[in-house]
Amino acid sequence: YNINVIVMVCREIELGKKKCERYWADRGDSKRFGDITVTLSKKEDLKDGYCLRTIKAEKGNEIRYIKQFHYTSWPDHGVPKTCLEILSLINHVRDVQSYSEDETTPLCV
């Protein structure tokens, strides 16, 4: 699949427990996963409780750019007090997906 949008709705650590593996690099760094190199091209902290990362993934001569939406305001325990931030995130994701060259490309959540 040629995934170009990833949506992540959990934090890396919640209630002191690791919830996901960090598969992106910090700005200025790269990470290797086998023969794939991942670099953070851009990070935008947005006002609606999430950030948008542009991740560059390289394997040999192939380069892909992936947009990762990371909702960082989900509380450690429970649910958000309002759905407005989630709705803003969904609208932004749909907006970015509408610019995709292949409309059949799945969304990775």
Swiss-Prot record:
InterPro entries: Prot-tyrosine_phosphatase-like, PTN12/18/22, PTP_cat. Transmembrane segments: none annotated. It catalyses: O-phospho-L-tyrosyl-[protein] + H2O = L-tyrosyl-[protein] + phosphate. Residues 1-109 form the Tyrosine-protein phosphatase domain. Pfam families: Y_phosphatase (PF00102). Its EC number is 3.1.3.48. It is an enzyme of class 3 (hydrolase). One of its GO terms (molecular function) is non-membrane spanning protein tyrosine phosphatase activity. One of its GO terms (cellular component) is cytoplasm. Substrate binds at D76. Keywords: Hydrolase, Protein phosphatase. SUPFAM superfamilies: (Phosphotyrosine protein) phosphatases II. STY 3 and STY 6 may represent a double domain transmembrane protein tyrosine phosphatase. Belongs to the protein-tyrosine phosphatase family. This is Tyrosine-protein phosphatase 6. It comes from Styela plicata (Wrinkled sea squirt).
